[in-house]
């Protein structure tokens, strides 16, 4: 599905508003129906979106919302730097190794990274979108931290978690 759970959305909004100025650059990976733009776009003005499934870009008018919309697989997308990168309901759609590569690439290209995932959630093709298949349907709080040691839990409950970039540096980026 092109949308995500409502859990903690307002908390994420407040967290980012408290931490960052309005003029930052945000990358919303897996833009879907534009949930994070709708959540943040009235405060932060420079938000780019990445969406692999072209019909979502057209059906949800993403090009009228985001500063830039990239119709590309995040595994192949190369970018320089964003203040915040949001992976909202994205990594569960990638094999573990691919998700690890994507997050490792993003780690040194942002000040903050937000990763939102559903726990233990099977999903197949939705609305003719093969990219909706969950390849990590076994995600839990425990294996999220094992698979992605660069992240730490920010908000969560028994069915959904928001993770943020863990500060793994001592004066210089090390990942």
Give names to the regions the model predicted:
Residues 90-93:
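Hydrophobic adenine-recognition pocket in adenosine-nucleotide-binding enzymes
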Residues 86:
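A conserved beta-strand element that flanks and buttresses the S-adenosyl-L-methionine
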Residues 1-81, 97-103, 129-146, 153-167, ...:
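Conserved N-terminal segment of class I S-adenosyl-L-methionine
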Residues 105-109:
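Conserved helix-to-beta-strand junction in the class I
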Residues 122-127:
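A short acidic, helix-capping loop that chelates divalent metal ions and anchors anionic groups
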Residues 110-120:
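Conserved beta-strand signature within the Rossmann-like core of class I S-adenosyl-L-methionine
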């Amino acid at each position: 599905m092109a949308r995500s759970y409502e859990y903690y959305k307002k908390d994420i909004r407040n967290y980012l508003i408290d931490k960052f100025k309005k003029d930052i650059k945000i990358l919303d990976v897996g833009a879907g129906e534009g949930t994070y733009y709708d959540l943040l776009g009235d405060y932060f003005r420079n938000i780019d979106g990445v969406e692999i499934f072209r019909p979502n870009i057209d059906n949800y008018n993403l090009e009228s919302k985001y500063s830039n919309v990239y119709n590309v697989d995040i595994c192949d997308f190369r970018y320089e730097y964003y203040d915040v990168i949001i992976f909202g309901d994205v990594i569960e759609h990638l094999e573990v190794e691919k998700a690890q590569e994507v997050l490792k690439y993003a780690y040194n290209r942002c000040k903050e990274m937000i990763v939102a995932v559903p726990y233990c959630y099977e999903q197949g093709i939705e609305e003719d979108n093969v990219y909706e298949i969950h390849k990590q349907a076994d995600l839990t709080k425990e294996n999220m931290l094992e698979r992605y040691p660069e992240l730490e839990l920010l908000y969560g409950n028994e069915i959904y978690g928001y993770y943020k970039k863990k500060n793994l540096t001592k004066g210089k980026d090390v990942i």
